[in-house]
């Protein structure tokens, strides 16, 4: 089970199949912007900067796999990414950024054949992509974590919900298959 790797491969294939400037091998990296030196060819940094448990889906009930067994619910998380384009000139960076924004606007759900690896097998039938509108202060704080790098235009997106199955084995239970109710009536005297 490698959910994060499968998510990364899904993002990478999705972008490479839709943005011509990023089709070359090695043009999409999952490194921190602090680790990237300006390349000669266009490149996109897809940096996972935060992982948060999804509080809305935290209380999901168990999933019955057989009449007498259930699985503990999966851990449901939200993944926060910043997408930062790199190119020789600012014009190409802006073109790549515009195409990223357009791609995620037009395709806000990853599903079906778009999902790579074992994402579907692990309960991730669809993963939504939505803009994470960071304020200027939040973006500034994020870029302060890369002290040797100058601020670069970035877009922040959240992928949600991402399900990570429980590592516990199925729990055996005795389910009520039939219920018998006896109703007795007491005679009332008038």
Where are these regions (language model features)?
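Broad gene-expression machinery/nucleic-acid interaction feature
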Residues: 41-45, 76-82, 152-156
């Amino acid at each position: 089970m490698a959910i994060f790797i499968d998510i990364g491969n899904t993002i990478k294939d999705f972008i490479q199949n839709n943005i011509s400037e990023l089709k070359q091998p090695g043009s999409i990296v999952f490194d921190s912007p602090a680790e990237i030196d300006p390349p000669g060819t266009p490149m996109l940094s897809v940096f996972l900067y935060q992982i948060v448990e999804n509080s809305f889906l935290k209380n999901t009930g168990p999933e019955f796999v057989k009449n007498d067994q259930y699985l503990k619910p999966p851990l449901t998380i939200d993944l926060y990414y910043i997408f930062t384009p790199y190119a020789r000139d600012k014009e190409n960076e802006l073109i790549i950024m515009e195409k990223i924004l357009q791609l995620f606007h037009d395709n806000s759900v990853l599903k079906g054949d778009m999902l790579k690896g074992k994402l579907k097998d692990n309960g991730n039938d669809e993963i939504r992509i939505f803009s994470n509108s960071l304020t200027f202060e939040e973006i500034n704080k994020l870029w302060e974590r890369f002290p040797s790098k100058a601020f670069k235009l970035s877009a922040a997106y959240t992928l949600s919900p991402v399900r990570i199955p429980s590592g516990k084995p199925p729990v055996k239970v005795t389910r009520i298959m039939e219920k018998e109710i006896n109703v007795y009536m007491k005679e009332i005297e008038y």
